[in-house]
């Protein structure tokens, strides 16, 4: 209360001024909330709420950038997929060229022309691999390895991707071939001949030590392993079957065949012996001459799976296309002997023997072989690349068909991987959008102003301000009346 009659101190006016100042601050705060839509625009408004809001804001910014990163990744992968599609189309053309060249009806000039076309096509495959880029980053030359896409707001929220080298020199058939019987898998041979018949199977310098059973394993560079126990009597077909049983997880396939070339000499009674393929019944052969011998063997092919052919030199070739062992037993007339250094013998006596075959492991990707030396397999596959195909000969064209087959398989596998990754990124984008929506909602709860409530509070503050001004005016009226007493 002011001192009566004082014109120097007006407590009522001071109270009114203080109230007006407080209401003015409230007005400013409420007007700021209305103009910005935020109840927290600085730490002064609500320190704890401000910290929470900043945390949500940081998370939301990270999510927004992660969505952008993922969309960029999708664009990159679409670029790589488009290039792979072009390469696959070119390799399909190479397949047609190889099949055409394998027909055997081409002249030497036509074969050379086909090889020229093949060279151009393989060069185009390599050109696509070396020139495909995204933002100056090479995608298909093998350098795009273990690249991380940051697809989340936090550390470690990444998707990793590698794209192999798809140049013509880097794709094709990865293979390892073994000829059974090359390393200690048969007994010392008996080269005797007699009037009653003999069988001479073997090769110069053939091993005579006892075979030790082993487990051969194979591991693909793309992951996945398989193994098979190999015994002394194992056929190439059984090894191939074991390999193919795991091809779904390893990508490694196997082909088996058994073939042996023999010199056939008729005895006093022509040829008399028994012939059997692994798992088939024994067939008795009684032939007067080599021509009759071939006819009889081929007549039993449906049972034994063994075919016979005579070459221009008179050599007899026996083939079991599935890689089953060829068992020759009970020779009583005539003689058979391997030519050259064909190392395909399991065991021999004067009158019987078993011929093992070859098994070839093959894949579009590289692979390693454990204990492979026990059956003649190398420790790692050898690449027969698309760049090395030669379709100028029928034999080369047939090899090219297989190389092209696995080159296509490799490209298709890469395309499948690239096709799956954009789907993963798209799913991640959808999840991030949902997360961003929820974080935005939570941020709004923390910092957004309640406009109806703020409007009501502002109206109240404005009324209080008007009342304060009226009170201030009233409190100064009495002070002014004292001045009328002055003379």
Language-model features: where?
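Primary detection of the long, small/polar-rich alpha-helical "axial" segments characteristic
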Residues: 1-487
């Amino acid at each position: 209360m002011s001192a009566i009659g004082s014109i120097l101190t007006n407590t009522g006016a001071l109270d009114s001024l203080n109230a007006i100042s407080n209401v003015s601050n409230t007005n400013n705060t409420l007007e700021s909330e209305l103009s910005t839509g935020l109840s927290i625009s600085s730490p002064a408004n609500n320190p704890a709420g401000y910290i929470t809001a900043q945390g949500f804001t940081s998370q939301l910014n990270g999510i927004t950038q992660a969505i952008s990163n993922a969309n960029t990744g999708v664009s990159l992968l679409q670029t790589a997929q488009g290039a792979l599609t072009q390469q696959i189309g070119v390799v399909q053309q190479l397949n047609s060229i190889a099949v055409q060249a394998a027909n055997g009806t081409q002249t030497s000039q036509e074969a050379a022309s086909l090889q020229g076309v093949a060279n151009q096509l393989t060069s185009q495959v390599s050109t696509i691999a070396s020139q495909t880029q995204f933002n100056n980053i090479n995608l298909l030359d093998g350098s795009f390895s273990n690249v991380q896409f940051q697809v989340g707001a936090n550390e470690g929220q990444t998707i990793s991707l590698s794209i192999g080298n798809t140049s013509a020199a880097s794709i094709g058939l990865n293979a390892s071939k073994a000829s059974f019987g090359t390393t200690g898998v048969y007994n010392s041979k008996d080269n005797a001949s007699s009037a009653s018949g003999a069988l001479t199977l073997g090769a110069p310098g053939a091993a005579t030590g006892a075979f030790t059973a082993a487990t051969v394993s194979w591991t693909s560079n793309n992951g996945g392993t398989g193994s098979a126990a190999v015994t002394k009597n194992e056929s190439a077909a059984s090894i191939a079957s074991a390999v193919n049983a795991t091809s779904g997880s390893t990508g490694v396939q196997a082909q088996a065949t058994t073939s042996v070339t023999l010199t056939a000499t008729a005895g006093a009674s022509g040829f008399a012996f028994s012939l059997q393929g692994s798992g088939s019944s024994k067939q008795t052969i009684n032939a007067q001459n080599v021509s009759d011998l071939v006819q009889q063997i081929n007549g039993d092919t449906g049972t034994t799976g063994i075919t016979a052919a005579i070459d221009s030199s008179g050599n007899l070739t026996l083939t079991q296309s599935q890689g089953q062992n060829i068992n020759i037993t009970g020779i009583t007339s005539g003689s058979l002997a391997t030519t050259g250094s064909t190392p395909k013998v399991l065991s021999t006596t004067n009158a019987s023997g078993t011929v093992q075959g070859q098994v070839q492991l093959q894949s579009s990707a590289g692979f390693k072989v454990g204990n492979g030396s026990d059956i003649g397999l190398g420790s790692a596959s050898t690449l027969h690349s698309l760049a090395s195909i030669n379709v100028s000969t029928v034999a080369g064209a047939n090899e090219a068909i297989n190389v092209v087959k696995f080159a296509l398989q490799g490209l298709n596998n890469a395309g499948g991987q690239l096709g799956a990754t954009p789907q993963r990124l798209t799913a991640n984008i959808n999840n991030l959008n949902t997360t961003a929506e929820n974080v935005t909602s939570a941020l709004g709860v923390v910092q957004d102003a309640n406009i109806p409530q703020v409007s009501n509070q502002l109206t109240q503050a404005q009324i209080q301000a008007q009342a304060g001004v009226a009170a201030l005016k009233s409190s100064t009226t009495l002070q002014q009346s004292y001045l009328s007493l002055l003379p």
